[in-house]
Structures are given as C-alpha cells and as structure tokens.
C-alpha cells in the first residue's frame, strides 16, 4: 500500500502555532501585579480554562503566567477532538460542560471561534463484548442528560460512507462529537477572563515557588515576584519542572503522538456534508475531516515516551521529528477500514508530546502534601476535556468541593508509588490501549507488582489471582488451576462459581483473606476524642478497647470520609479507612489538628497488613493461636485487643465487612508470615480456605455496607445516603450548618437497595435506573448476593421512588431489566449473627 506525499510539510493555517493569538498581537500587557488571589502557571487549555472559570466562580483578582505564548505547548498541535464519551459520570459531566461552553464561545458575535460541534462520531467495535460495553456507557451517559446511540455495522456505514463494514459489528454514536480550533479556543477563554478582571502575562517564566508560614505563596518569575493565596500548576509537559519547585513529583509522562493531514479528497468534496469522526479500538487510530481532507491519528504499539530525561528549555511551538515507520501496522488497519486513504497524499505530518498519568485520567485537584496548591495536569485529551476540568477545579479552589464527586481526578489517589519509571510503563500501556476501555475486574499488567506484602508470593503460590487497589496487589479470588484465565466481560463470567464457593466457606466454616494496603493512622495525644467529635458527625466511641464506625462531612454537609476508630489505649487511637484514602484522609486530619501540638498523627499503612478471619468457626481458630480470651463474653463485637497470633504481635479487632463473625488481625509486615502460618495451621481442622476481595464485595452488598467513593460520595449528605443513624445533631461538627439547611429542604436523592430480575449479568456503577422510561437514578455498585440468591444493586434514586416495593427498571448491559426496591441489608438485617452473646 502506497501513499503519495505532498512536497513539503508546511503547516496548514488550522494547525499553526499561536504566535501570538489575536488577544496578544499588537497589545501591551498591563504591568505585572505584585499580589493576587491565585496564580495559574501555564497558558494552554488547562490554564486558560482554569483562569476563566475562577472568574466565573467570583475570583476576579487572578492572573495567568506563561513562559512563551498562549497555546505554545501541547495545545497548539492538538488534533482537538471534543466528545461526550467518558468512563464514569464525572467525566461525562465535565465533557458535557466543555461542549456547552465551547458552543457558547463559537456563537459569541464579538469573538466567534471555529467549532464543528455536530459532525457526530462513531467508536467502532468488532466484538459483542465491546458492544455490551458501549451499551453500558450509553446507559451511564443518559443519567447525565447525554444521549448516545449503539448502532450496527450497516448504520455505521450509512452515517460514514467512506468506511468498509468488514470485521465490524457496530459502534457507539455520539451526535455531538466534533473538533475545535485550539488556539482560538484558548484566546477566547483568556479574552473572557480578562473582561472579568483577570490578567495574563506572556513571556513570563516561573523560576521558583516559595510557601510561607501562613500557607500563602510567592511565585518568582523572570519579570518579578507575585504574592498569592493559591498556586495552580497547569504546565502540560513541563508539569514536573514546576512540581519540583514545590518539592513534589507528579506521576505524569509525555508520549510522542503522531497524526497526518491529507490533501483534499474528492469523495469528501462531493459528499455535501462533513464526515463523522471515527475512533477505532480494532486498529488503534482516529480519523476526522480536516477541511476537504482527513486527519488520521495513531496509537501505535511501538510508541515512545518523551522528555523523561529533561526537556529543552527552548522547546515551544515545536514538534518532534515525524516517524511514520512506527505506525505501519496502524496504517494498514486504517486503509482496510477506509480504502480512500490509500490514494490520498499527505499534506502535513505532526508529531508532538501529549501527557498521560498512571491510570490515564488527569490529575485535577489539590497537590498532595501541599496546602493552597492545585494542579490540572495529565490531560491527554485536553481540548475536549479542558473546559470541564477547569470548571471543576475552579469550584474546588473557591468552594472546597465541586458539584460532582471528583475522586477519579484527585491527585491524591496515587500514594507514593507514582515514580517516573512506573509512570512511563503505565503511560505506554494506556497509549497502546487508547480506545480500549477497561472491563470490570480488568487489571492490566504493566508496572506490576509495584506494592506488595510479604504474603504476596505466598498467596500467588496458593493460586491467588490479584486485583490492584491503590497500587497494592490484593487477592481477588483463588484460581482452580494454574492455567485458569477469566474472560473479561460486563456479564457474569467463569469466576462466578469460584466466588460463590468462597462465600459458602466463609458462611459455613471459616475463611482467611489478606487486605493489603488498608489505611491506618495512629493518633496519639491528649483530648483526642474531643478533637474527633468536631470532625465526625456522630458520637465518637471513647471507651478503651472499643471500636466505632463514623463519618466525616465536608463544609457543604456531604460525606467526606468514613473510618473505623479503634481505642487501643487511653491516649492512642487507630484510625482505619480505605486503601485509596491514605493521602486524602491524612491531609484532612492534618488540616484540622489543634494548633497547640497536643495531637500527633503517624501513618502505619506501610508498616502493617491486615488479615481477615471470618465465619462461624473464626473464633475457634483464633482461640487456638492466641492466649487472649476469645469467648463472646471476653471478646465481643466491635472490640479491640492487643496480643499475639502465634509468635507474631497483633492488634485484633472484632469487626466484620462480611456480616459473618469476623476478626481483623493487624500484623507488622516483618512478622506477617508468622501470623499467617499460625492461622493456616490452626484452621486446617476447621476447613479453613482462602477467600478474596470479590467474595468480600458480594457479602458487603448483602449486608448494606457502603464503599467509599462508590456509594459514599461528596455529592450527597448522610441522610440521603441512609446514614442518618450515624448523625448527632445535638453536637457541633464540620458541615453541621450546611447539613441542617439541606435536611430542611428535603432529600434530593436517596440511596436504596435494588433486587434485579435477571441472572446473566450484574448491573454496574453508573448504570441508569428508570421508571416508565424516564431516568430517575443511578447505580453506584452492584453484584450477586450468593447467600440471599439475589442480583443486587445500590442506587441513588428520586426520593418518591425509594420506598421498598417500588418497581423500577435497572439497566444491565445497557438494557432495562425489572427491579424492585428492597429493604437495605437483606442478609441478617438485624445483625443477629454479630450481636449474639453465646
């Protein structure tokens, strides 16, 4: 297959760098301020969007500094696709905001910009599993007011007449897919921000950052210093140059990315309409119309990182050398799908850096370990998402939270393991799978293992299959044989019966599991309980040797965090929460410490690992390996003891996430294996077997136990989440006034438990819940309950649809299935198993 090349690679006007934009050309910028509320560093889409949205949230005294011209980094050479498609509702919502914002900019009579916002786009599929995934994502988008359509191969060809239907089942249609002029977009945002009071300083390089005792900042630049309250890193591929000035490393890596623009194509000139965009996970490319030709971009397997060893300080408005030999395989797939490409001449080749994070999702929010510092970085699809990311970040900065739960974007979701080598491996993997979405329970192999315990190889030898939780390898289930492989799908798969057998073992005898990475913070000092009372919305258990569960709210009265509080000694508490919450919770606690230094915090997350012993024989097994009184009278529910498990020192808590009698055994990592061996040997006579996180997930759904950032979201308050019993309005706590106001206005949604009338697949987080064809809610988590024999889901629904017995429809594989609201916690709802005294 041969492609004709045009002579020369001059840039088309649409692809030119901004040298400078209309807003800067011929104008003298104002003298630089010495003080301001916020300084945004970086003049690409991330910085311009953040600046504009800060003014929209009421902060007019803000500035942006850019080392060169606006859009001179990645933004200027972006292919600039704008789509509604996202992997969760937060991403769909922010992209929908981008589209609405860009449309308003394009319609501004004073400064219109080029935005093709209704060409439509198709994500192709050649397997039924991909089509089922698209149906799920279409269901999820409906809950955000976004309408996708799943279409067959013939309809794909009707809407895009240049494609072949060979090896094609269908695709996902986004009617609002399109593309935008990146330079014009950023200039329009900067223009609106200036009109609202913001200032932009070009050719102003940041040389250092200094944070003061009052937590304010000084931004040192080549044109002078600026004192400010807040600093925002929006530096694109130079993110870690500015990060280093704060003493932090951001897990962001740049990848070389190539596309070319063809000469005019006769079939396009004759079509009479613009061609839709194509995104192809089959052959790893995208293609859209550019003037009267096509723009074809590649995500080749033979890809390259960029800038790992430093970036030329003069690299601006620049590109990397083109290397089309790397993309030969991708080109062959594109030619087969669009034969017209084989006769097209290349007009322009573009190869420039784009940024990726460890999980492919941008880092938007607080900089870990720093106060009054934020970032908006790692935007691999910056033009399409940038409007929404800047919108959410501005809300976080001004109000403390955004209108959506933004944990999927939070920079604190990576807790110390995001080094440069891991980031490079994951960036390569994500680049190679750009259009291949993750299936449920799919954990890709690059950069694994990065966080392990001494038991990881032991459990692997026992047949464990591992999930990844905050970088930690965590046992998901035990494989029946070494060559067992599950088929990743949105349906129930080969693991269904395996997990059921593990649940049965826990229910009828005894099971043992490892919970790696469990977040634990030791709190010591005087007045601990009084301090915690001001943080938790419910009463804090104060008695030594007692364990309690509580919830913290943000200043808006919505759920911030959940934790167990274990009273080890009179002046020593263990705070325990989700593995992913390690940095998040520590920073929240630190931010509210007494100024007198009477209370100290110490992370024990990496020093200990938790074993869970659960089932009716758990107490008997524990009694054989410790001299503690393990009777129900001596060691009842929600108590904590210090002792030994075999020869290993341990902190043992009688708490359960399964609903069965259970003990959390916290062991120092250097003696973890000793404790594990003692339990395995003692358990042999009682039929002990290993069980994993998938069994735990099933059992917690049956018990009505909620997961942080799945069911516990900053969008809802504890009353709406069904946690009213954990709130004590007779005391003061953070968020109380806001909560009182919300309660007086009535619930906006309510969290309910649903029983779904189908057995072939679970629902999944984000799926729509409907009544008479109208979306009235969203699934937060779902799965099969083996002990109750039900297909279960949690969902936030309209308050008048929350009564048990209400009949609804829940989307499963994107299609509505009958469902009914049931009482929460269908397994042992009265906790008789956990409360029994004998």
Which residue stretches match the model-derived regions?
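C-terminal catalytic lobe of FAD-dependent flavoproteins
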Residues: 282, 318-438, 443-447
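Central beta-strand plus flanking loop segment that forms part of the substrate or channel wall
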Residues: 79-84, 120-123, 248-273, 329, ...
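Glycine-rich FAD pyrophosphate-binding loop
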Residues: 55-75
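Glycine/proline-enriched, intrinsically flexible loops and inter-domain linkers
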Residues: 404-405, 410-838
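Flavin (FAD/FMN) cofactor-binding and adjacent substrate-gating region
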Residues: 101-104, 125-196, 201-202, 207-215, ...
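Beta1/beta-strand and adjacent pyrophosphate-binding region of the FAD-binding site
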Residues: 33-46, 63
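Dinucleotide-binding Rossmann-like beta1-alpha1 core, especially the glycine-rich loop
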Residues: 79-159, 282-287, 293, 321, ...
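Flavin-dependent oxidoreductases
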Residues: 49, 112, 208-321, 329-340, ...
